[in-house]
């Protein structure tokens, strides 16, 4: 479970973290941007994974303290599912909290995609 159990704050933490990650990936993956008819090249070629890694690190350092920053539904759901099949003594998979790291990142990713499409 999270270090700080506040459903509303944890949901928005996951939403914001995923929003930032997806929005950054969209800009990194698109090596040029057209603004008022002028094409601006900013792609960095083979180093594209480096800024994504830095973005994930920054998200972890800023938003990771409260929830552990799933920022990907599979990162939480897969281990939680396996944990319920392979339980450990005196531990529970905490399904009452499981919707936050699933729904928060999905909403954040959709909002990032919508905003990117509006801006581009």
State each model region's role.
Residues 1-120:
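Membrane-interface helix-loop junctions and terminal tails of multi-pass membrane proteins
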């Amino acid at each position: 479970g999270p270090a700080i159990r506040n459903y509303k704050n944890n949901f928005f933490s996951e939403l914001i973290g995923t929003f930032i990650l997806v929005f950054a990936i969209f800009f990194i993956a698109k090596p040029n941007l057209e603004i008022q008819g002028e094409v601006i090249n900013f792609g960095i070629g083979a180093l594209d994974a480096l800024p994504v890694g830095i973005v994930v690190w920054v998200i972890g350092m800023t938003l990771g303290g409260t929830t552990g920053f799933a920022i990907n539904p599979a990162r939480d759901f897969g281990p939680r599912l396996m944990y319920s099949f392979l339980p450990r003594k005196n531990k529970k998979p905490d399904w009452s909290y499981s919707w936050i790291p699933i729904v928060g990142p999905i909403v954040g990713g959709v909002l990032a995609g919508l905003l990117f499409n509006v801006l581009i």
